[in-house]
Curated annotation (Swiss-Prot):
Species, as recorded: Staphylococcus epidermidis (strain ATCC 35984 / DSM 28319 / BCRC 17069 / CCUG 31568 / BM 3577 / RP62A)
Catalysed reaction, written as an equation: a 6-phospho-beta-D-galactoside + H2O = D-galactose 6-phosphate + an alcohol
One GO cellular component term noted in the UniProt record for this chain: cytosol
Top EC class of this enzyme: hydrolase
InterPro entries: 6P-beta-galactosidase, Glyco_hydro_1, Glyco_hydro_1_AS, Glyco_hydro_1_N_CS, Glycoside_hydrolase_SF
PANTHER family documented for this protein: GLYCOSYL HYDROLASE, LP05116P
Pathway: Carbohydrate metabolism; lactose degradation; D-galactose 6-phosphate and beta-D-glucose from lactose 6-phosphate: step 1/1
Alphabetical UniProt keywords: Glycosidase, Hydrolase
E.C. no: 3.2.1.85
UniProt protein name: 6-phospho-beta-galactosidase
Amino acid sequence: MTKKLPDDFIFGGATAAYQAEGATQTDGKGRVAWDTYLEENYWYTAEPASDFYNRYPVDLELSERFGVNGIRISIAWSRIFPKGYGEVNQKGVEYYHNLFKECHKRHVEPFVTLHHFDTPEVLHKDGDFLNRKTIDYFVDYAEFCFKEFPEVKYWTTFNEIGPIGDGQYLVGKFPPGIKYDFEKVFQSHHNMMVAHARAVKLFKDENYKGEIGVVHALPTKYPYDPSNPEDVRAAELEDIIHNKFILDATYLGKYSRETMEGVQHILSVNGGQLEISDEDYKILDEAKDLNDFLGINYYMSDWMRGFEGESEITHNATGDKGGSKYQLKGVGQREFDVDVPRTDWDWMIYPQGLYDQIMRVVKDYPNYHKIYITENGLGYKDVFDEKEKTVHDDARIDYIKQHLSVIADAIADGANVKGYFLWSLMDVFSWSNGYEKRYGLFYVDFETQERFPKKSAYWYKELAESKEIK
């Protein structure tokens, strides 16, 4: 049976400043922690990435031609405030005005994120969001943007608060590269949620036009053996780290008893304590009903087993399938030997997980208002067909189709889902995989920066026109 998506559904493509723009030191942009981290640890940098800083008119023309009517863009904080505060870089401000103008000219609605993994280096060195001064600077930056860019109708404060804490302090694959520090993980989550709440409250108090929300990565966690209490507990604890703690802060304005019990257990085993003030709870509570929408980024699910032992994570950055290991002291271990297809990077392809996660939000957080799927897509070692100047990415089409199908099911079952943004619009730079891992509708030749629509782009165009998942 053919499934249909609503007539007002957004068929979007997603980007992020640092992964797309390039121009990392151009026109007064300040440094971010990633600049130094990549120079010191990797064989690639984010220069020139997809050169979106100069080529955005090309990408937006392609968007219009291929039926993409929404784009996720992030503003690079250090392009506006090179140090994160203080002096404004006027050239950066002009760039984003020009970019948003081009979006509207091409009938592509910009959904704009204020922070996508790129805290200015000056603030990052000073503790990033573990330092509460960064919260104040972020709110000042947010207020500047709300005032300066009234042409933006859809704002999100942060992209993926969970993976920031996880990447910086648990897995250690983001700067500053700290591993297994649960105190820092939860404190980062919490402080960023306070920053989010303050920005949302300010947006509403000052009556800015438009809508505001937040983008959370919500990977679904299942027990490997649902009849084994240890596996069930491991899935619950892993869910608290990645999903429940942050969702509670967003929509309950506090942390539920089960959430705090899980956090205290993890910290008692690993050491550390969480600092939360009454003022924090007050602002979380004041903001909990003010989010106009939730952005859900979903790529994969995980299966958890009970585990007694030390923390050890091996991150698969090469795309050699089977290279991953993930076990956390006091939490559990991920089981990769499950009967579910997975990518070369060991990401479990499980569309049902997206359905389950959407319906979990609907059930547990009824004040969610509406949902956009703000990222979903398939990372692949695309093979470019020189003769036909395209990529025959049938696996990507199949992946998108399966996930859109469960979105249609969730809508039919009462979820208010208003749009889908494919990660990514064009091929972009990947944080921990460089230029090997491609996601785009449009193939980018990173040598020449030419764009070539993939087979998936033609499929997406037909989908956007018919709204039918075929």
